[in-house]
């Protein structure tokens, strides 16, 4: 797969080029993007999908908005974040996942929920104001209730091993419950939130160099067998150092992350619940940090009611 960047109608655009053998991925991503209900400020803006000829070879183009800051992983490798930067990045990421998972658009129109199935920091792009947009929907799945268990089973076991939830690594996903696919996304989202938190200067002291989740435990591209040992059997998660908890906002965020990567899928927060927490933190920042425990337990109660 290749990428091009060029000026189209006086605007820089990005072109994702799929070779013939990746037609299925192009087709799936095109179908996801052409759903008008997908449009959202935290979802990569789609422009067009085209079939092109390069000599005797066919190739398939996906044309989208261009974001010069690149992906989240590279951005975090280059930059240290303020608390405000973290709030914008994490909040916009959560907002995008919430929109994907929702049964309704922000305007109240019904929509089919979508599971991304490959949330990771390289599949998140950075806009100019330190806000995130989700991209790469090549293996995304429409959670259409009219589909059968067999249809979902045929969608295959996909994703990136480092970011796979325990139940995916164990091949024990409950295909009869569409919420299972959302729960897997929430686990992966929690790892990305941890990556963002790890580069925030609100923790005090020296901010460590960027490393991916489980970076000190596994090699650069770990296989599923290795991740099973770490995540499934060892029940390990990325470290949350104690100095992160000295900042009340970070403490609140870390509690949320921990609840999102719970080993039990049913115990994880929904993306909607996480979005509500971020909205509350944004709207009542100073009040929240002075009363974090009261708000925490109140909000957990609300989330449990939602489930």
Regions found by a protein language model. Name each.
Residues 1-19:
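Glycine-rich ATP phosphate-binding loop
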Residues 17-48:
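The N-lobe alphaC helix and its flanking beta3-alphaC-beta4 segment of protein kinase-like domains
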Residues 45-60:
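Short beta-strand micro-motifs within the conserved protein kinase catalytic domain, predominantly
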Residues 67-77:
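Structural motif in protein kinase domains
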Residues 101-127:
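Catalytic-loop of the protein kinase fold
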Residues 122-163:
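Activation segment/activation loop of eukaryotic-type protein kinase catalytic domains
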Residues 169-239:
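Conserved C-lobe activation region of Hanks-type protein kinase-like domains
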Residues 266-307:
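Regulatory extensions flanking the kinase catalytic core
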């Amino acid at each position: 797969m290749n990428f091009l960047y060029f000026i189209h109608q006086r605007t820089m655009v990005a072109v994702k080029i799929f070779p013939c053998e990746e037609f299925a991925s192009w087709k799936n991503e095109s179908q996801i993007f052409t759903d008008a209900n997908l449009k959202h400020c935290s979802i990569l803006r789609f422009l067009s999908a085209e079939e092109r000829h390069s000599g005797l070879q066919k190739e398939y183009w996906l044309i989208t908005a261009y974001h010069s800051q690149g992906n989240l992983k590279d951005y975090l490798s280059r930059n240290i974040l303020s608390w405000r930067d973290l709030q914008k990045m994490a909040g916009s990421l959560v907002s995008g996942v919430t929109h994907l998972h929702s049964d309704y658009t922000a305007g109240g129109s019904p929509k089919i929920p979508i599971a991304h199935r490959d949330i990771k920091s390289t599949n998140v792009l950075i806009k100019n104001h330190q806000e995130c947009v989700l991209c790469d929907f090549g293996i995304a799945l429409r959670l259409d209730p009219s589909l059968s268990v067999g249809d979902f089973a045929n969608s295959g076991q996909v994703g990136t091993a480092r970011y796979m939830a325990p139940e995916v690594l164990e091949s024990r996903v409950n295909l009869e419950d569409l919420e299972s696919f959302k729960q897997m996304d929430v686990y992966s989202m929690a790892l990305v939130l941890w990556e963002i938190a790890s580069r925030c200067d609100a923790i005090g002291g020296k901010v460590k160099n960027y490393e991916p989740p489980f970076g000190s435990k596994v090699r650069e591209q770990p296989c599923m067998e290795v991740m099973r040992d770490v995540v499934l059997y060892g029940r390990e998660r990325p470290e949350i150092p104690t100095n992160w908890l000295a900042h009340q906002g970070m403490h609140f965020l870390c509690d949320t992350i921990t609840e999102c990567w719970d080993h039990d899928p049913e115990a994880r927060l929904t993306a909607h619940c996480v979005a509500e927490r971020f909205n509350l933190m944004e709207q009542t920042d100073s009040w929240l940090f002075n009363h974090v425990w009261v708000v925490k337990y109140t909000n957990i109660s609300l989330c449990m009611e939602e489930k």
